[in-house]
Amino acid sequence: MRFKSIQQNIEDEGKVNVREVNPDSYAERDHGYTAGIFSDAEENFGITQQVADSTQNPTSKPKSRHAHFHETVHENPSEYSRSKCKQPTNEKEYDKAIEALVAKAIVEEHSGQQFPVYKGLEQYTLLQKMGDGAFSNVYKAIHNRTGEKVAIKVVQRAQPNTDPRDPRKRQGVESHNILKEVQIMRRVKHPNIIQLLEFIQTPEYYYLVLELADGGELFHQIVRLTYFSEDLSRHVITQVAHAIRYLHEDCGVVHRDIKPENLLFDSIDFVPSRVRKYRAGDDPDKVDEGEFIPGVGAGTIGRIRLADFGLSKVVWDSHTQTPCGTMGYTAPEIVRDERYSKGVDMWALGCVLYTILCGFPPFYDESISLLTKKVSRGEYSFLSPWWDDISKSAKDLISHLLTVDPESRYDIHQFLAHPWISGSREPTFPATDAPNTAQRENPFTYDFLEPEDVAAAGSAARTPGVNSLREVFNISYAAHRMEQEKIRKRGQRGNQGIMNFMGDMDDLMEENDDYDDGTKSVEHSMKRVNLSGENDPSLASRQPAQSQQQSSQRSRNKFKGFQLNLSKATLYNRRHRQKV
């Protein structure tokens, strides 16, 4: 009965609208009562399913899935609930929806863009592919009746394995993993978190219908703008922090995968800068970030939205308000486990802040093993000249987030109270293990390739270097999650009772499987992409001969401390060529 508290919590908060689509008729099933026809494991997550009446007319017009979802979810309204669907109330709104569909159909007809036909999504028209993963695709779509634009995550269900060499291997995502993500997403309602609108399943796929953030990924804006100003960085990271605070303190959830790819944004109108400001080492052709408007944003970046809860887990139960235990009887080991779990998100917050301020991640190496070692040891630096013009207060804040010891790392309340965030003029101090911000890096030469102007984030995201950078983020965060898991398990040794209890929680969250499978997948992806660029003819052709010789020479040299070969990372190519 280890699932009892979470099960009760879900029942108290209301049911998730889960729709099972009949593969024969694909008619809408909506009978008005729920029955648990999932397996026992699925029921333990508090997920219910709509069951069809055998006498239902398969030709009857289906109701709006969105309308039924909100009837169910808003039995207990939340102050953060703001995800009501746009329901046309007059002929004019219906005309607009139809016009949008026709316009898009014309565009697609001329572009020749085609999408798979997914049974169960007949009420939606797919407009654009926004991203993909090993077993999933994300599409921008429009609801055929209401005209509401949404994002739909299409996840392939695990199918029976036909490979006799590995009978345990299954292609696709297991039901308990996707249902865990759904269970967590339906609990959270916050303006800085993408909302789950509907969950649909067929024999082949799971469909997560999500709110659409029209700006796309923050990652693409880092590529486009190279880096963000301190004002825009503060605007972005503060919103992410508020989402984390809500998850940690109000929901008892840790995200465990906070990175630029999973930070989406609502776009705003661009206002050109009245006076352009440049930092040392900037390319004169750097894209204008635009005028920062307090409370609104800059560079088309408005409201930030946290997405993708595939690696999330619950660390405490809302009934006891304590970390996974009974009030007043919680062992120190479990309290520390909650601290370690939340610390993973705070570390990631520091990585994101570092990256958006300077344009590259704090941990980088072409070797996966060396990269993971640097992450586990916290070996980073504020590289000159790119950090020379960034305030000491910002560096101090980052140092408190990237400290190796989770007991010393800032929690979300300390982060939000820091002078750089709050805007106070109080003096700030670095963490005890922070790098020396006054020391200049070892005097070796950075050679940059001549950059090609990136006209749009979409084209930039398809370059080999950008794909490599994505994998650097993935490896860095996976390595840190595993390191924190080792620390947590070491702290549990010697107390078998606690080990058994936490073992149950591990089973509930499948966190060990997440770590192992996720890391193997990322390492495989890393091996497929070309981190170095040495074998990429398109990069080699743009690199001057002298640069190639110097790059080869640097690979034979040994430097102490943090090593970063900037000539081989495409994101850096947008920076001005300069000798340090």
Curated annotation (Swiss-Prot):
Induction: Induced during environmental stress. One of its GO terms (biological process) is cellular response to osmotic stress. One of its GO terms (molecular function) is protein serine/threonine kinase activity. Its cofactor is Mg(2+). Belongs to the protein kinase superfamily. CAMK Ser/Thr protein kinase family. CaMK subfamily. The active site is at D257. PANTHER family: SERINE/THREONINE-PROTEIN KINASE (PTHR24347). Residues 51-91, 530-580 are annotated as: Disordered. Its EC number is 2.7.11.1. It catalyses: L-seryl-[protein] + ATP = O-phospho-L-seryl-[protein] + ADP + H(+); L-threonyl-[protein] + ATP = O-phospho-L-threonyl-[protein] + ADP + H(+). PROSITE patterns: PROTEIN_KINASE_DOM (PS50011), PROTEIN_KINASE_ST (PS00108). The lineage of its organism: Eukaryota, Fungi, Dikarya, Ascomycota, Taphrinomycotina. This is Serine/threonine-protein kinase srk1. It comes from Schizosaccharomyces pombe (strain 972 / ATCC 24843) (Fission yeast). Its main location: cytoplasm. Changing K153A: Abolishes kinase activity. The keyword Phosphoprotein applies. Keywords: ATP-binding, Cytoplasm, Kinase, Meiosis, Nucleotide-binding, Nucleus, Phosphoprotein, Serine/threonine-protein kinase, Transferase. It is an enzyme of class 2 (transferase). ATP binds at M130, G131, D132, G133, A134, F135, S136, N137, V138, K153. Phosphorylated by sty1. InterPro entries: Kinase-like_dom_sf (IPR011009), Prot_kinase_dom (IPR000719), Ser/Thr_kinase_AS (IPR008271). The gene is srk1. Residues 124-421 form the Protein kinase domain.
